[in-house]
Amino acid sequence: MAFFNPEKFTSEAIAKLKTELSDKAIIAASGGVDSTVAAVLAAKAVKGNLLAIYVDTGYMRLGESEYVSSMLSTLGVKHKVVDASEKFYAGLKGVTDPEEKRKIIGELFIRVFEEEAKDYGGKFLVQGTIAPDWIESGGGLRDTIKSHHNVGGLPEDMEMELCEPIRELYKDEVRSLAEYLEVSVSQRQPFPGPGLAVRVMGEATPERTEVVRQACHIAENEMELAAKEGIMELPWQYFAVLIPVKTVGVQGDVRAYGNTIAVRAVHSYDAMTAQAVEIPVSYTHLTLPTICSV
């Protein structure tokens, strides 16, 4: 593999963006590493002609909207927060298949961005698409592993011109670029584009989504604490999933019947393959009682 030079890539990407973005542009900013890096590059290229749109789909992490807004302000990226949660909840009503969820969310994202682009006068849509996104989404001789909402979910009648400045980069290269650009989320763990909708197995209703939102927050915080205390190595990705099966348990001396939450942790060196991480018993002793209270 050729050595990745973030300084050289930044210079070339900004020059290319100055040529490509001949009019006002908006960027889909999720707060993740990929979209934030793309936003910083585009902002350096076209400055005030870029508006970052953060869409609150209702399937975001706990406190995410406030976090992303603060981060973009610190980075000097002009942005707008759009609450489209009701639109996304309605679009996923009755949907249980994760692949269908991804495609519906992809189309809804574009429709929201088209509305915002009309208000702003934007002609271009910048996205933080990276190599694993289009590889996993299939096409040609490649099998579809999973459709990424920013690839397989894009509608054919999209009105904006697409610009993807980091499309050829892999996750480790994006993180290296983020560190060079002094982006605070450079080592933030990956979060799926469709959000918690794909961490709710079955229908992602607002109520079920809130359960997994709280569970993810607890599981992630406790795992980060365990890593700091030397109980375990911090995994590459770690989160909770709501299983569509209820189970019987005992709380005190009383029968309990409630949701089933799974906690998953994996290591990955390329952001495309993963190996399960053995979670220490001491972590589960600390975390499970809190998750069970959700």
Please identify what each model-predicted range represents.
Residues M1-L286, S293:
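ATP/NTP-dependent adenylation/nucleotidyl-transfer catalytic domains that generate, transfer
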